[in-house]
Amino acid sequence: MEERNPTHDTEGRLGTVEAKVRKIVESLGEDVGYQFCNWAQANVALDDVEKPTIIYVLPPSGSFHFKWNEVLDRPNAQIAFVSPTDFDFDGTENDGIVEAMKRLCIRFVRAVNESGYFSELEDDIPYQVLYDHLDHNVTGVVISPTLVEEAGVNLCNEPERLEDD
């Protein structure tokens, strides 16, 4: 998986929430795919998915938490756990895929909690079952947690300014 934002993510420091999520997904192994996109892009990208995939959907909103020395990003995330299925799927087979994606979600949440990148996800995390929502035949679950960074942008240093060339 390539770096998505080299301006803010470096070898020594992951400066974006997306890079932290990507790193967590990478820790789950090569048998899990990863996509970072909006739902329209995911609809196209899923045409080529052949293995269970975690989709970090471009967050629609969030909040900043300002402290005396740093700012923490708290995006309202949508994270989908999907796997390909047949067009005319059997209910029992599809239920097995849903259950497998729930287990992948549990692995992901455990990895988030062990990563130290975000506050622990605990208590109730509602999910929605996903099938027949996209053009490609995938089944899975979607969660919508608020990811709270443990380390954010340092306010003691001058924030980098992006300028046009």
Pin down the residues of each PLM region.
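Short N-terminal edge-element motif at the start of the domain
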Residues: 43-46
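A short, hydrophobic beta-strand-centered structural micro-motif
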Residues: 49-61
